A protein has these predicted regions:
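N-terminal secretory signal peptides
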Residues: 1-21, 25, 29-39
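Short helices/loops that flank or line small-molecule/ion binding pockets
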Residues: 98-112, 125, 143, 208-223
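A ligand-binding cleft/hinge motif common to bilobed small-molecule-binding domains
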Residues: 116-126, 189-190, 216-217, 221-242
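Extracytoplasmic small-molecule ligand-binding "clamshell" domains
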Residues: 47-120
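Hydrophobic residues within well-ordered alpha-helices
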Residues: 104-105, 161, 215-216, 258, ...
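Periplasmic-binding protein-like
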Residues: 55-63, 134-146, 238-273, 291-307
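An extracytoplasmic/periplasmic, membrane-proximal ligand-sensing/linker region
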Residues: 66, 72, 76, 271-366
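Bilobed "Venus flytrap"/periplasmic-binding protein-like clamshell domains
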Residues: 54, 58-82, 94, 140-213
Length: 366
């Protein structure tokens, strides 16, 4: 993971501390400062506490390439969001899925853009609720997982990869990444008896940008990635991108979700959802500016209001992953295998029931 360190610094306005992505220790030092500064007015404390100025809303940002780049891309939308809700919105930008997952567990973000897998975890742990998701359209332009290799590399086709995975060096994303881990496992590797975590000669786990660079520079033979990040990579690294080719493409992935902390005031929930659903829809210069922001975030069609039922496809993917892992595992007995499969079925049934109940409650409250 990226490890360059910079100190936490106040914003130009002096309003609040913001964590600058660094090595993990520095990140959590910054986070602690944020938490202390804002804890007094957090709604989770249950208070209708009066404060002299609105408490900033902390927006968790998944890393695109670097954390600073991700924060800068989101800054215009967060500024517009703050004006719409009458409350500052500050970006909580991290260097990894793990860091953002820990921030969610520690209640250090209030709203976040998450992968479908991370959103599923946050919702089923009863920490967050779905506000909106990236709007998609059908066709080959949809967001899909891909496998990348060098055009002039020793590995240049899928048959060689599946036939002898132990020969090749893999670069992949965190296990919470749908396109960088889950879909390649479910659709390609596990059906061919290959465990992505153990079958390859070596393994690099990093961002989509870093995995593509690893293959382009000869530090890995194959990388998981996705069509959206590959498009961004081609714009930022045209020389390196020209060395790459796609040897496998998945079905369309579940969209990324924007989630809000459970217990947020209903009025805040409604205003945020209305802002996201309407962002980029206006005519004239304002709409043009918003659409440019959305394009930079690879959400050209904007966002659509959603509830927790939007995570049903993610729950099904998680079920398929767990089932295939169990079927490929070695078991001491058939009874042990069947017990595991039964637990997987029960977990999936509970998730579906929870998502449908929460979605129904959200719809009734509108």
């Amino acid at each position: 993971m990226p490890s360059s360190a910079k100190p936490c610094a106040p914003s130009a306005s002096g309003a609040a501390l913001r964590p600058v992505p660094t090595r993990r220790v520095a990140l959590w030092q910054c986070t602690a400062a944020l938490s202390l500064a804002w804890a007094g007015a957090a709604w989770a404390q249950g208070g209708a506490r009066q404060v002299s100025s609105p408490t900033p809303l902390r927006f968790g940002i998944l890393p695109f390439g670097g954390a600073v780049e991700s924060r800068d891309r989101w800054a215009p939308l967060l500024a517009d969001m703050g004006r719409a809700i009458g409350r500052p919105v500050v970006g909580f930008s991290v260097t990894s899925y793990e860091s953002l997952g820990q921030a969610l567990q520690r209640d250090e973000v209030d709203i976040a853009m998450l992968t479908a897998k991370m959103a599923l975890d946050a919702v089923t742990q009863r920490r967050m609720r779905v506000l909106a998701q990236v709007r998609r359209h059908g066709g080959n332009s949809d967001h899909r997982a891909v496998l990348l290799v060098r055009k002039d590399g020793a590995l240049n086709n899928l048959a060689d990869l599946l036939g002898n995975p132990g020969r090749w060096r893999l670069a992949r994303s965190d296990s919470r990444s749908v396109s960088g881990f889950i879909l390649p496992q479910v659709e390609l590797f596990l059906p061919n008896g290959i465990s992505i975590e153990t079958a390859f000669r070596s393994e690099l786990v990093d961002t989509h940008q870093a995995t593509a660079l690893a293959v382009a520079n000869g530090d890995a033979d194959v990388a998981t990635n996705n069509t959206t990040d590959l498009e961004r990579f081609r714009e930022q690294f045209p020389v390196e991108a020209a060395r790459l080719q796609v040897i496998w493409t998945s079905a369309s992935t579940p969209p990324a979700q924007i989630v809000l902390r459970r217990g947020a005031p209903p009025e805040l929930h409604r205003r945020l959802q209305a802002f996201l659903a309407g962002y980029g829809a206006a005519d004239g210069p304002r709409g043009d500016a918003e659409r440019a922001v959305l394009k930079s975030l690879r959400a050209a069609l904007g966002y659509e209001a959603e509830d927790d039922t939007a995570l049903l496809p993610a729950a099904e993917l998680e079920y398929q992953l767990a089932w295939q892992r169990a079927m490929n595992a070695a078991w001491v007995s058939e009874a042990a295998k069947q017990a595991r499969l039964q637990r997987i079925e029960q977990t999936y049934a509970r998730q579906v029931a929870l998502l449908k109940d929460e979605g129904g409650a959200a719809a009734a409250g509108k």
